């Protein structure tokens, strides 16, 4: 065999020949390949399961004392399983509320696997800054209404007025009712593919955010 050519397993099969200059790139052993694979899988697992830590409830300020609370999955996205697709007009609607002086409070019981990158997703899709409260345990995720009601109770104790609320599931509306947010200030979002909104106490079932923007701009007063 030519001194500049060597046999290499894994490149064209056993016995295939490559030059010595290529062998450093192509003649990886099985253990090398497996090490790279395990590293990639491990890194993906760590990234994918990174859980967002609990957020503090800040006190209201003289210039901001009212909050708008809302669910994320199914409310800012078309369905609760479409975690990467924003609803049309959702960011515009929330930015309008933010400009009026309302603090935006995001609530979610999303599983840890899909929590990583949530802050970046909100920012990338143009949603305004706000408090982001994520369920920390399986127990909290299993009882979404209780988890969200507890967060809202913490805001109320801190002195916030819970002015408006948006959601897509019955558990959202249960939490809002427990927080004593008036029915006239609670709105439901219909999920994609559903014939109607889920049961609950709310003023209206919205097809989407775009149709609600005019209402926000004309009917919801400034909180400043």
Question: What spans do the regions from the language model cover?
Answer:
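Catalytic-core regions built around general acid/base machinery
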Residues: 89-100
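Non-catalytic pre-domain segments flanking phosphatase-related domains
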Residues: 25-28, 34-70
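Asp-based phosphoryl-transfer active-site loop
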Residues: 61-81, 176
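C-terminal cap/substrate-recognition subdomain and adjoining C-terminal extension
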Residues: 100-103, 111-224
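Short, basic, low-complexity termini and linkers enriched in Ser/Thr/Gly/Pro
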Residues: 9-31
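Glycine- and small hydrophobic-enriched segments that form the cores of compact globular domains
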Residues: 67, 78-81, 87-91, 106
